[in-house]
Amino acid sequence: MQKLIIHGGKPLEGSINISGAKNAVLPIMAASILTNKLHITNVPKLTDVSTMKDLLRNHGACIRIIEHTDEFELIINTTNINKFTADYEIVRKMRASIWVLGPLLTKYGKAKVSLPGGCAIGARQVDLHIAVLKSMGAEIEIEDGYINASSKGRLKGTHFIFDKVSVGATINAILAAVLAKGETVLFNCGREPEIVDLCYCLIKMGADILGVGSSTITIKGKDCLNETSYKVLSDRIEAGTYMFAAAITKGDVKICGIDYNIIENIALKLIETGIKVVQINNGVQVTYKGKLNSVDLETNPYPGFATDLQAQFMSLMSISSGVSMITENIFENRFMHVPELCRMGADIVVRGNKAVVRGVEMLKGAEVMASDLRASVSLILAGLSTNSKTVLHRIYHLDRGFQDLEKKLSNCGANIKRV
């Protein structure tokens, strides 16, 4: 099994180009079911993207891949969709597989999707996905580990209030509503940039969507959607991760190819810690200024601080001067990286959904194990900050969400290699 060997202690210096957003491209790929052909550019080279390709092919899609140095183009032809079951063997690898449920159901009137897998960071139930589709007239049962959904005729527009903000359920609802009969109004929606990007893609396909980027989205269903091409937005989670990498290594790095508006909350949090963050033409420059202050953090739905960056921020706070309180409001089991950070000398105590982080002068290298995607990269950041050797095991998590991570870090001076 592969592992990463990290020799820390070198400030990162240089520039890093940000890849396409995993959490945007996956629902956009699922949206290809709604039309006959979709041409997607700025697609990151990730195992989750490969899993979604396998899933779409399993349903009968034909996918042409055009490979470039830093990205893929995908041309997805779905005119021959002929299978409506998303099998466990594929779905277990990635929770985002559930996003084929809405498109299959709204276009073909039937879908059978295995209950999803992915990172082990909490329950992340499918209740809201099922509830909103039922409100559109779907008949849904869970049998033998599968969501079995059907509709008599087209799905119907609905007014639906999510009882809590759910990115995944918002996406499935939008994907179903664009071909439903009549008007759908969704309340308490997720507002994440990746949801906005999906909506812009659907609008380019001919969908009628109002309220994009707000908590209330209105959709007037169409009989069909058009073929189109679409460029996926850049990954704010990847950008934030490298911003923290610059800070934790006391470096000076330009993060390029990212819209400042979608990383502003990350930049402001870093500035609060004493790190210099300057907006540049196509991104930000992050510079260590001699001190790292402890600050508190709460994760919340966008525009709040992303849960996908909580572990990375905790690594940074583990070498700050003072005590910080990190509160995880999204997932109930997202502190699994804490024991591994403590193996490296971090002083962290977890109390329910809160972690008290007492900064230490320096972490020390150790053999550590990744429990999920974001935890894996938080341990890499921790390893980069040490003056010794860190070995990270179970790095297959990493390849689900970070393209060319070793190359991007090495180009900025990091000593990191995969063996």
UniProtKB/Swiss-Prot annotation:
This is UDP-N-acetylglucosamine 1-carboxyvinyltransferase. The modification 2-(S-cysteinyl)pyruvic acid O-phosphothioketal is found at residue 119. It comes from the Bacteria. One of its GO terms (biological process) is cell division. It is found in: Cytoplasm. It holds the Pfam family EPSP_synthase. Belongs to the EPSP synthase family. MurA subfamily. It catalyses: phosphoenolpyruvate + UDP-N-acetyl-alpha-D-glucosamine = UDP-N-acetyl-3-O-(1-carboxyvinyl)-alpha-D-glucosamine + phosphate. CDD domains: UdpNAET (cd01555). HAMAP family: MurA. InterPro entries: Enolpyruvate_Tfrase_dom, Enolpyruvate_Tfrase_sf, MurA_subfamily, RNA3'P_cycl/enolpyr_Trfase_a/b, UDP_GlcNAc_COvinyl_MurA. Keywords: Cell cycle, Cell division, Cell shape, Cell wall biogenesis/degradation, Cytoplasm, Peptidoglycan synthesis, Pyruvate, Transferase. UDP-N-acetyl-alpha-D-glucosamine binds at residues 95, 164-167, 308, 330. It is an enzyme of class 2 (transferase). One of its GO terms (molecular function) is UDP-N-acetylglucosamine 1-carboxyvinyltransferase activity.
